[in-house]
């Protein structure tokens, strides 16, 4: 068993040895061949041709004799092959000629093909680009076709969207604002989803223009005589448009209503100041009250429930309304003051009553401005009175320039009353009839009484001091005029003229001035002045000349002209009337006290001027006290 197992091992080893030796022999033969035929046959050439390799290996395995005969055999084989080739060429020369021609033609055709291929290769890039463009255009055409097909299938829906601007414009122009707001909300949703589509952008822009037109129409409605329900609808639409904040909406509302009010006030004729201011009062009272009512019904002045967002400032919205009302009241007061300064005649009491009613109506909305009217009317009243007093002084001076002291029967009998004594109403003051003897004094008193009667229509107690001062200044000027007349005419006075001049001064100081004091006490009752100051009537003299002229001051410049008299200690009841107890306050609708109404005395035949009667004018409307 052991010997049997050994035999295959030795056989395998000998086979392996033989194969190895053969491989080594082939390697040696190849190396030998490579070194022998290095110059004739490159190694790469015979290695690539198997027949050359076999032949060389066959030669390397041949004997010496064979190697000697091999060149001859090769020469014979070569000669034989050459002969066969000649025979073949001779037998088939036509075929070879034809083949050569075909080969030449094929070469020529191959050249043409090569040239054509070159041109084709040169044109292939442009063809490739054209094909790409064609594919792209085909894809676009296909996409457009699909879009056109989709557009055709949804033609109705697209048409509705494209008609939105036209429909929006129709709704706005026909005042269908609710439908217009619904369309605007739908367009806003479209914009959020398809803002990149140009058609949608165009629709959005056209709808915005229609919304701007709608905004202008709504604000224009607020500039007309619109009622509260319509105001509520308009403000509701403006809030839905979400264009203004709450504060801006309030300002816009007030601006629009203010423009309407200004148009009404501008349309009032401005020729007659009284007509202009009465119509202005009526228009402001009615329309301003309506605007305030509308504002309070639409907007709430309560504090907001939620605090403002981050970055937003807290706006005092109630101050907007109060500031506007204050501005309107200020503008009305300016117009009132302007028209009063232009002059409204003797209708100041009627105008005061209308203004007071206007202010009273505004008290219901918390805008009572009656206190602002007092300075305006006081200033107008005192200015009118001062102007009338100044005109009276100028008129007195003109008459004194042409006045001559002439004795007349009326003068000599001045102590007696005229035959036809005028009849006066109870409670009125009768002017001194002795003034008829001296026309300048009579005319001066008449002018003063006209000023008093005009002042009586609107006579605040606060004007007592200014009226008294104005009257004192006028009397001081009259005194200077009298002194100037005396200096100019004294040298030419006769004894009779001197006596008449003394009577002139006496009547001026003892009749005219005390009568003016009594008129002042009727205009400004001492009891009323004391009640206003909150003092007893007996202490009124401590506060100066309130409501009466200081006669001694007026008398002092003329003292050297008057005759010397014994001092009398009894008080004249006419000069110092008994001060009544404070009168109870009158209700607003109570009639005013009886005015000072001078009576026209009889006029002598001597050509003296008549003392004009200045009866109280009848007011157009009941006046209210200040």
UniProtKB/Swiss-Prot annotation:
Keyword Translocase: no
Membrane disposition: Peripheral membrane protein
InterPro entries (alphabetical): COG8, COG8_Metazoal_Plant, Cullin_repeat-like_dom_sf
Membrane-crossing segments per the record: none
Gene: COG8
Pro residues compositional bias, start-end: 580-598
Chain residue ranges for the region called Disordered: 580-626
Native species: Bos taurus
Major subcellular location class: Golgi
Keywords: Golgi apparatus, Membrane, Protein transport, Transport
Name used for this protein in its record: Conserved oligomeric Golgi complex subunit 8
Locations listed in the record: Golgi apparatus membrane
Source taxon at top rank: Eukaryota
Keyword Transmembrane attached: no
GO-annotated biological processes: intra-Golgi vesicle-mediated transport; protein transport
């Amino acid at each position: 068993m052991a010997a049997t197992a050994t035999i295959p091992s030795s056989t395998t080893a000998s086979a392996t040895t033989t194969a190895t030796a053969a491989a080594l022999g082939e390697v040696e033969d190849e190396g030998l061949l490579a070194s022998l035929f290095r110059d004739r046959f490159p190694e790469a050439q015979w290695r690539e041709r198997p027949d050359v390799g076999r032949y060389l290996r066959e030669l390397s395995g041949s004997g010496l004799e064979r190697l000697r005969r091999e060149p001859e055999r090769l020469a014979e084989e070569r000669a034989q092959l050459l002969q066969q080739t000649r025979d073949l060429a001779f037998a088939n020369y036509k075929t070879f000629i034809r083949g050569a021609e075909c080969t030449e033609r094929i070469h020529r055709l191959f050249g043409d093909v090569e040239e054509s291929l070159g041109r084709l290769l040169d044109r292939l890039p442009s063809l490739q680009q054209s094909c790409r463009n064609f594919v792209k255009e085909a894809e676009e055409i296909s996409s457009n076709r699909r879009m056109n097909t989709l557009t055709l299938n949804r033609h109705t829906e697209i048409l509705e969207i494209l008609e939105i601007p036209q429909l929006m414009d129709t709704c706005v122009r026909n005042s269908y604002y609710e439908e217009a707001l619904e369309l605007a909300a739908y367009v806003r949703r479209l914009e959020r989803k398809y803002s990149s589509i140009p058609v949608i952008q165009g629709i959005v822009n056209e709808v915005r223009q229609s919304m701007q037109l709608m905004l202008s129409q709504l604000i224009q409605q607020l500039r007309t005589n619109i009622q509260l329900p319509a105001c509520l609808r308009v403000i509701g639409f403006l809030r839905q448009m979400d264009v203004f904040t709450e504060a801006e909406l309030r300002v816009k509302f007030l601006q629009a209503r203010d423009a309407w009010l200004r148009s009404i006030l501008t349309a009032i004729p401005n020729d007659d100041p009284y007509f202009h201011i009465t119509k202005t009062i009526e228009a402001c009272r009615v329309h301003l009250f309506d605007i305030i009512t509308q504002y309070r019904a639409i907007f709430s002045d309560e504090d907001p429930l939620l605090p403002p967002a981050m970055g937003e400032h807290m706006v005092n919205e109630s101050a907007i309304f109060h500031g506007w009302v204050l501005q309107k009241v200020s503008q009305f007061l300016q117009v009132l003051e302007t028209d009063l300064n232009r002059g409204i005649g003797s209708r100041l009491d009627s105008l005061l009553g209308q203004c007071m009613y206007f202010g009273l109506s505004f008290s219901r909305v918390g805008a009572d401005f009656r206190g602002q009217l007092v300075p305006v009317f006081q200033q107008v009243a005192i200015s009118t009175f001062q102007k009338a007093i100044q005109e009276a002084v100028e008129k007195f001076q003109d008459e004194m320039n042409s006045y001559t002291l002439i004795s007349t029967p009326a003068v000599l009998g001045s102590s007696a009353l005229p035959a036809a004594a005028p009849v006066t109403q109870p409670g009125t003051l009768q002017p001194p009839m002795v003034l008829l003897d001296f026309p300048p004094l009579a005319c001066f008193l008449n002018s003063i009484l006209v000023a008093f009667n005009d002042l009586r229509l609107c006579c605040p107690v606060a004007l007592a001091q200014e009226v008294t001062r104005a009257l004192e200044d006028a009397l001081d000027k009259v005194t200077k005029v009298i002194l100037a007349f005396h200096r100019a005419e004294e040298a030419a006075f006769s004894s009779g003229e001197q006596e008449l001049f003394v009577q002139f001064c006496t009547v001026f100081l003892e009749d005219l001035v005390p009568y003016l004091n009594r008129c002042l006490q009727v205009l400004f009752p001492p009891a009323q002045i004391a009640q206003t100051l909150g003092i007893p009537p007996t202490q009124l003299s401590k506060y100066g000349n309130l409501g009466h002229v200081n006669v001694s001051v007026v008398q002092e410049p003329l003292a050297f002209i008057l005759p010397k008299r014994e001092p009398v200690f009894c008080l004249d009841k006419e000069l110092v009337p008994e001060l009544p107890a404070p009168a109870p306050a009158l209700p607003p609708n109570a009639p005013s006290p009886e005015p000072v109404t001078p009576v026209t005395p009889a006029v002598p035949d001597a050509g003296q001027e008549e003392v004009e009667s200045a009866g109280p004018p009848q007011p157009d409307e009941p006046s209210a006290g200040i």
